[in-house]
Curated annotation (Swiss-Prot):
Highest taxon above the source species: Viruses
Record function comment: Transcriptional activator that increases RNA Pol II processivity, thereby increasing the level of full-length viral transcripts. Recognizes a hairpin structure at the 5'-LTR of the nascent viral mRNAs referred to as the transactivation responsive RNA element (TAR) and recruits the cyclin T1-CDK9 complex (P-TEFb complex) that will in turn hyperphosphorylate the RNA polymerase II to allow efficient elongation. The CDK9 component of P-TEFb and other Tat-activated kinases hyperphosphorylate the C-terminus of RNA Pol II that becomes stabilized and much more processive.
Protein name per the record: Protein Tat
Subunit structure: Interacts with host CCNT1. Associates with the P-TEFb complex composed at least of Tat, P-TEFb (CDK9 and CCNT1), TAR RNA, RNA Pol II. Recruits the HATs CREBBP, TAF1/TFIID, EP300, PCAF and GCN5L2. Interacts with host KAT5/Tip60; this interaction targets the latter to degradation. Interacts with the host deacetylase SIRT1. Interacts with host capping enzyme RNGTT; this interaction stimulates RNGTT. Binds to host KDR, and to the host integrins ITGAV/ITGB3 and ITGA5/ITGB1. Interacts with host KPNB1/importin beta-1 without previous binding to KPNA1/importin alpha-1. Interacts with EIF2AK2.
Primary location class: host cell
Basic and acidic residues compositional bias, start-end: 13-30
GO molecular function list: metal ion binding; RNA binding
Highest classification ranks of the organism: Viruses, Riboviria, Pararnavirae, Artverviricota, Revtraviricetes
Chain positions covered by the region annotation Disordered: 1-30
UniProt domain comment: The transactivation domain mediates the interaction with CCNT1, GCN5L2, and MDM2.
Keywords, alphabetical: Acetylation, Activator, AIDS, Apoptosis, Host cytoplasm, Host nucleus, Host-virus interaction, Metal-binding, Methylation, Phosphoprotein, RNA-binding, Secreted, Transcription, Transcription regulation, Ubl conjugation, Zinc
Length: 30
């Protein structure tokens, strides 16, 4: 489960997209 509260107020769907972009800088986004 991804923490939507981590700067992702748009929702889990957008969160996944953000994670893909933050994966390299956000290891916790996994």
């Amino acid at each position: 489960p991804l923490p939507t509260t981590r700067g992702n107020p748009t929702g889990p769907k957008e969160s996944k997209k953000e994670v893909e972009s933050k994966t390299e800088t956000d290891p916790f986004a996994w």
